[in-house]
């Protein structure tokens, strides 16, 4: 029997308020989107990516064998700071991509099918 828990600590990054309610096409036309693509840690936001990392890291540190099913920026924040990456978007997961940490190294699961 496996126990599991659900936590609000892995909710989406509470980023830019002026993106809420807009389509992706509209968002891509903003100056913030240019910064987001280059170095999102430079954005002035409601919640920094480091703050996102801190709330996710708390779960990671308090559990063994942790599986996070979450939005891309939330998991990327965690991986970026946990692994001390040099560039935020370097190892950004693709949609539905499975990434994991093994021996403090980022690994990617490749579906053999």
Ranges and model annotations:
Residues 85-110:
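Domain-level recognition of soluble alpha/beta enzyme cores
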Residues 29-51:
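Short glycine/proline- and acidic residue-enriched helix-loop micro-motifs
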Residues 48, 52-60:
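Alpha-helical packing segments of well-folded alpha/beta enzyme cores
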Residues 63-73:
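Generic beta-sheet signal
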Residues 1, 27-28, 57-64, 100-101:
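Alpha-helix C-terminal capping segments
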Residues 77-78:
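Phosphate- and divalent-cation-binding pockets in alpha/beta enzyme and binding domains
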Residues 1-32, 83, 93:
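Phosphate-coordination/substrate-recognition cap region in phosphate-metabolizing enzymes
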């Amino acid at each position: 029997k496996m126990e599991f828990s659900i936590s609000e600590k892995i909710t989406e990054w509470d980023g830019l308020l002026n993106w809420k309610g807009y389509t992706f096409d509209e968002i891509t036309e903003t100056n913030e989107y240019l910064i987001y693509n280059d170095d999102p840690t430079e954005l002035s936001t409601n919640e920094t990516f480091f703050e996102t990392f801190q709330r996710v890291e708390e779960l990671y540190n308090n559990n063994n064998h942790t599986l996070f099913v979450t939005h891309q920026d939330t998991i990327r924040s965690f991986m970026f700071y946990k692994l001390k990456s040099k560039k935020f978007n370097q190892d950004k997961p693709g949609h539905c991509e499975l990434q994991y940490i093994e021996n403090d190294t980022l690994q990617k699961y490749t579906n053999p099918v």
